[in-house]
Amino acid sequence: MMKLRHKNKKPGEGSKGHKKISWPYPQPAKQNGKKATSKVPSAPHFVHPNDHANREAELKKKWVEEMREKQQAAREQERQKRRTIESYCQDVLRRQEEFEHKEEVLQELNMFPQLDDEATRKAYYKEFRKVVEYSDVILEVLDARDPLGCRCFQMEEAVLRAQGNKKLVLVLNKIDLVPKEVVEKWLDYLRNELPTVAFKASTQHQVKNLNRCSVPVDQASESLLKSKACFGAENLMRVLGNYCRLGEVRTHIRVGVVGLPNVGKSSLINSLKRSRACSVGAVPGITKFMQEVYLDKFIRLLDAPGIVPGPNSEVGTILRNCVHVQKLADPVTPVETILQRCNLEEISNYYGVSGFQTTEHFLTAVAHRLGKKKKGGLYSQEQAAKAVLADWVSGKISFYIPPPATHTLPTHLSAEIVKEMTEVFDIEDTEQANEDTMECLATGESDELLGDTDPLEMEIKLLHSPMTKIADAIENKTTVYKIGDLTGYCTNPNRHQMGWAKRNVDHRPKSNSMVDVCSVDRRSVLQRIMETDPLQQGQALASALKNKKKMQKRADKIASKLSDSMMSALDLSGNADDGVGD
């Protein structure tokens, strides 16, 4: 038995519990009965880090020199190619072959013009059918520059064949882009078929309180038509009011607005509503679904997406802005048609180019003028053609088509339909009113009662305008049968005058104390603000802006009151005429 003091004793080298430490490397095998000598492996060869860095620097320097030599050789080779005439001719031939190949591919794929797909066209036609079904009166909007080109006879035939005895009215929009004499001729031509109303939509970009001018279209001057205010709304509302009165409508009517893309359907609705109720733009296809807009408690407007008629020429479809300009595969051909139809002198003056003989020369000059280039520094005729088409559809290039010399009634219309439409809308009364105003037309320019002016001056013009005679007559319980001369009460302000200069307004005797508040000189207001303490100028400016907003609201209230007074006066005159006739 082991003693306790020997129990934890470490075993010695010769004891039984001692293990011999083995050599970490394997023992060499015996060769020919003799034990081989063991070789201890030596440490690897040590390489200094600077040797690797120097080697890499040498390789990089050699690579940079090789690349520099290759670039110099490529530049010299390119320089030699440019110097030779043969290489230039070969480059021209290569580009011509590429262009011809591109034309062949376009013709094979039938990519001109790129209209909407079949599903989209069916969806638009479905929305059009819904508008026709729900409407009592259909307003077909036409472009005054080309009314017959924008007129869709298939659409009119579908409206006349629909159930419910639908009524159809033509609206000649964009009359500010056509001379006044041409507009009158088109009105006389179209009124032989259907009731026609001249109209100009508002071109303002604000959301509310769109301006509307009460001056009749026949009486408005050229400068007045070029303003941003709306024209023809009163006449159109009178036509719809005649339908409600003669048709004995007890509740309300729905008025559908249809037509080709980009003829101004949504702009017409916004002008009647005097607010931005529908999205508008110079690109076709913005309106995709039927939209209902409440005009008042008697009239509801239905906006429909534009429809492109089936049998139509490709170039004509593009020139009527029925296709996106940026999606055209070949915009050069429509530009060639424009140069054939329009006055070349006006186009040359507009773009500042002259002396061109072909369409290619014209587009190259326009590309040089506008800076339209492509890769290689060459002028892009495609981009120049798209820019010309964009100016065409936006109305910057003036053009119009005169009405035909002889009138022929379309096949889908008959004498009975024309007579019925005339009696329902009482067009003869409207034409007689226009003739009376033409007789009272003075030699001077018309007044811009609700044009694009400052709110202070707008209120001054409203208070001085002859429309106050109607309001005074209604207050005195008298009947007004005819609106007198609307000219000569205030001068036409220069809307392009810069700064805070005074407007030349003919101040007549004022019966309202509001005029003294509105006729404050704006220069004196600024002068008072500048004379105040610099620490209080911000507060003074905020107070001036607050007063300006107050004047704007006051002018809007007066405008609405005067418009209501005018409509009630016209109703009184119509009832008086009926009583005299009885």
UniProtKB/Swiss-Prot annotation:
Residues 58-88 form a coiled coil. Its main location: nucleus. Pfam families: MMR_HSR1. PROSITE patterns: G_CP. There is a cross-link at residue 477 (Glycyl lysine isopeptide (Lys-Gly) (interchain with G-Cter in SUMO1)). Keywords: Coiled coil, GTP-binding, Isopeptide bond, Nucleotide-binding, Nucleus, Ribosome biogenesis, Ubl conjugation. GTP binds at residues 173-176, 259-266, 303-306. Residues 1-58 are annotated as: Disordered. Residues 48-58 have a biased composition (Basic and acidic residues). Residues 9-35 are annotated as: Required for nucleolar localization. One of its GO terms (biological process) is negative regulation of protein binding. It is found in: Nucleus, Nucleolus. One of its GO terms (molecular function) is RNA binding. Residues 125-310 form the CP-type G domain. GO terms for cellular component: cytosol; membrane; nucleolus; nucleoplasm; telomerase holoenzyme complex. Interacts with MDM2; this interaction, which occurs in the nucleoplasm, stabilizes MDM2. Indirectly interacts with TP53, via MDM2-binding. Interacts with TERF1; this interaction probably occurs in the nucleoplasm and is increased during mitosis, when the nucleolus is disassembled. This binding may promote TERF1 homodimerization. Interacts with TERT. Belongs to the TRAFAC class YlqF/YawG GTPase family. In contrast to other GTP-binding proteins, this family is characterized by a circular permutation of the GTPase motifs described by a G4-G1-G3 pattern. Stabilizes TERF1 telomeric association by preventing TERF1 recruitment by PML. Stabilizes TERF1 protein by preventing its ubiquitination and hence proteasomal degradation. Does so by interfering with TERF1-binding to FBXO4 E3 ubiquitin-protein ligase. Required for cell proliferation. By stabilizing TRF1 protein during mitosis, promotes metaphase-to-anaphase transition. Stabilizes MDM2 protein by preventing its ubiquitination, and hence proteasomal degradation. By acting on MDM2, may affect TP53 activity. Required for normal processing of ribosomal pre-rRNA. Binds GTP. This is Guanine nucleotide-binding protein-like 3-like protein. It comes from Homo sapiens. The gene is GNL3L.
